[in-house]
Amino acid sequence: MKLAVIPGDGIGVEVTAEALKVLRKLVPDLETTEYDLGARRYNATGELLPDADLAAIREHDAILLGAIGDPSVTPGVLERGLLLNMRFALDHHVNLRPSQLYPGSKSPLAAQPDIDFVVVREGTEGPYTGNGGAIRVGTPHEIATEVSINTWFGAERVVRYAFALAQTRRKHVTLIHKTNVLSNAGAIWTRAVETVSAEYPDVETAYCHIDAATIYMVTDPSRFDVIVTDNLFGDIITDLAGAVTGGIGLAASGNIDASGTNPSMFEPVHGSAPDIAGQGIADPTAAILSAALLLRHLGRDGDAARIETAVEADLASRGDSKVVTSEVGDRIAAAL
């Protein structure tokens, strides 16, 4: 297995080291190439994602990312120039966000044992394509636009991914949108679900407005199995999903090219947390769960399940003890 590793900034370096520790336990022939991308390189050279690095990254089976971001860089520079650029260049059209309540979780819904759903978010369209602008800036007549791009091709392939995933789970897909107001984009998404669902007669479907979905995710999260939604609504609902299941510190994610043409990227949802970087107290659990997602994406379901079982046992045994980054990685690796 050839793995491109982007530790990134802040605690990304520390948590990635623990994820690699776990991966190497299960994949002895793992070949890794590290890429220095993020705030440090940008501050030193002005480079964000050089063409040579992108071309080299394409030659790997998958990508493991730590975290990107630093107070020394203007907000938005790294996000647009590195993360979004990579997402579009590698056609990571599926953003996959599992949301499971683990034992010992600090979730406010910890008393509800059956929280286990996945959000499938479209990753390359919507209002995040940069299709907008502003005129008369600084005047009372300033106008700003952000155009949301929705295509049949983009919606259908993400919906198809969601149905295939649901068939391996509880066989239920919920489309989340705002079709009563966003009627043009909503029509594409609704027809995509109707079209693909005809090929999966054993998968039930449901629809939920985004505002109602935020209520149900708190009051009745077990109603969800696989959620499919667009880029903007997915961006919002996945953070709520993280809070419901104990916080984004435990949240793993995958940025996936479902066609397999490009390597997919896996990363913890949490940020670079520069305030605790270098102290050895960052929880690497989300990075380790991201490694499990990576293995499952590459067809190593058994190894992924072993990691998830070890993580579940580790979380259940922690109690109120303080997290030491390397010790968490050691315990989970030893449990394999």
UniProtKB/Swiss-Prot annotation:
It holds the Pfam family Iso_dh. Catalyzes the oxidation of 3-carboxy-2-hydroxy-4-methylpentanoate (3-isopropylmalate) to 3-carboxy-4-methyl-2-oxopentanoate. The product decarboxylates to 4-methyl-2 oxopentanoate. Binds 1 Mg(2+) or Mn(2+) ion per subunit. It is found in: Cytoplasm. Homodimer. Pathway: Amino-acid biosynthesis; L-leucine biosynthesis; L-leucine from 3-methyl-2-oxobutanoate: step 3/4. PROSITE patterns: IDH_IMDH. It is an enzyme of class 1 (oxidoreductase). NAD(+) binds at G271, S272, A273, P274, D275, I276, A277, G278, Q279, G280, I281, A282, D283. Substrate binds at R87, R97, R121, D211. The record marks Y128, K178 as: Important for catalysis. Its cofactor is Mg(2+); Mn(2+). GO terms for biological process: L-leucine biosynthetic process. One of its GO terms (molecular function) is NAD binding. NCBIfam families: PRK03437.1. It catalyses: (2R,3S)-3-isopropylmalate + NAD(+) = 4-methyl-2-oxopentanoate + CO2 + NADH. Its main location: cytoplasm. InterPro entries: ICDH/IPMDH (IPR050501), IsoCit/isopropylmalate_DH_CS (IPR019818), IsoPropMal-DH-like_dom (IPR024084), LeuB_actb (IPR023698). Mg(2+) binds at D211, D235, D239. Belongs to the isocitrate and isopropylmalate dehydrogenases family. LeuB type 2 subfamily. GO terms for cellular component: cytoplasm. It comes from the Bacteria. This is 3-isopropylmalate dehydrogenase. Its EC number is 1.1.1.85.
